[in-house]
Curated annotation (Swiss-Prot):
Active site: residue positions: 134 (proton donor/acceptor), 162 (schiff-base intermediate with substrate)
Organism per entry: Anaeromyxobacter dehalogenans (strain 2CP-C)
The protein, known as: 4-hydroxy-tetrahydrodipicolinate synthase
Reaction(s) catalysed (UniProt annotation): L-aspartate 4-semialdehyde + pyruvate = (2S,4S)-4-hydroxy-2,3,4,5-tetrahydrodipicolinate + H2O + H(+)
GO cellular component annotations of the record: cytosol
Length: 295
């Protein structure tokens, strides 16, 4: 298995007139590779994976894999709050040639820690495919605790975790209980890339990399190489742009930002609605101040 590390983008899913725009997706993927991105993560939260049909998810993952052609990692979004559906999604990612699957903790039904353990264990037993568990309690209302991550790692059921709690004590606990390099530790929070890596993280699955991929890659390289001053300066420079990517619910602002770059339309799928004019103005202003060239 390839090492799951570096600067990865939670890539948006371009849409046009209600349909997935695969041509624009290919162009976005090629641009990401040209900018130095280490991994493409389609069909995640930012990629609106939960509102894509099964056929659309297959088309998106296949398009990314065929475009990448082994030049970067592909970690395919494959989560569900039904274990049997998650298993089928991971099998799809495996059959299409992804390097790993990103599997969010089951949302809405709020399983216990034992339920979470059995969920990921069942996926592993049914697929024998590398899974990155995705812990984002703010969206799922369930928290995958370090003790459960340690159980899963010991059982070989997960290859990594995307941790989106923005809690550095949590990351310290993970390294302590699981082991520094036992699994891949990936930040799911662009605001904390530097401290996360300093606490043993291996990289990030990033939202802002959709509009500033080279800047995120440079931040990750600086942080992983121990260039604290350089990494801190890069993290600080991104702060306002990071905030504006969440001025409304993700992926609304980042899709609007991608559209402002002229790289794809900003269309969203319901129940997500376009960002307000006031929010769009804030996004545009932050992009200009960061030095991005708008279309």
């Amino acid at each position: 298995m390839r090492r799951l590390e570096g600067s990865m983008v939670a890539i948006v899913t371009p849409m046009k007139d209600g349909a997935v725009d695969l041509r624009a997706l290919r162009e976005l993927t090629e641009w990401q590779l040209a900018e130095g991105t280490d991994g493409i993560v389609p069909c995640g939260t930012t990629g609106e994976g939960v509102t894509l049909t099964p056929a659309e998810r297959a088309d998106v993952i296949r398009t990314v894999i065929e475009t990448v052609r082994g030049r970067a990692l592909v970690i395919a979004g494959a989560g569900s709050n039904a274990t049997h559906e998650a298993i089928e999604s991971v099998k799809l990612a495996k059959s299409l040639g992804a390097d790993a699957a990103l599997v969010v903790t089951p949302y809405y039904n709020k399983p216990t820690q034992e339920g979470l353990f059995r969920h990921y264990q069942a996926i592993w037993e049914a697929t024998r495919f590398p899974v990155v568990a995705y812990n984002v309690p703010s969206r799922t209302s369930v928290d995958l605790l370090p003790e459960t991550v340690a159980r899963l790692a010991k059982a070989g059921a997960i290859a990594g975790i995307k941790e989106a709690t923005a809690n550095m004590d949590r990351q310290v606990q993970l390294v302590e209980k699981v082991g520094k390099d036992a699994i891949a530790y990936l930040s799911g929070d662009d605001f904390t890339v530097l401290p996360y890596i300093a606490c043993g993280g291996h990289g990030v699955i990033s939202v802002i990399a959709n509009v500033a991929p080279r800047a995120m890659k440079e931040l990750v390289v600086a942080a992983r190489s121990g260039d604290l001053a350089g990494a801190l300066a890069k993290q600080a420079a991104m702060a306002e742009l990071n905030r504006m990517m969440f001025v409304e619910t993700n992926p609304g602002p980042v899709k609007a930002a991608v559209a402002l770059l002229g790289r794809a339309g900003g269309e969203l799928r319901l129940p997500l609605a376009p960002v307000s004019e006031a929010s769009l103005a804030k996004v545009r202003e932050a992009m200009v101040r960061f030095g991005l060239k708008l279309a």
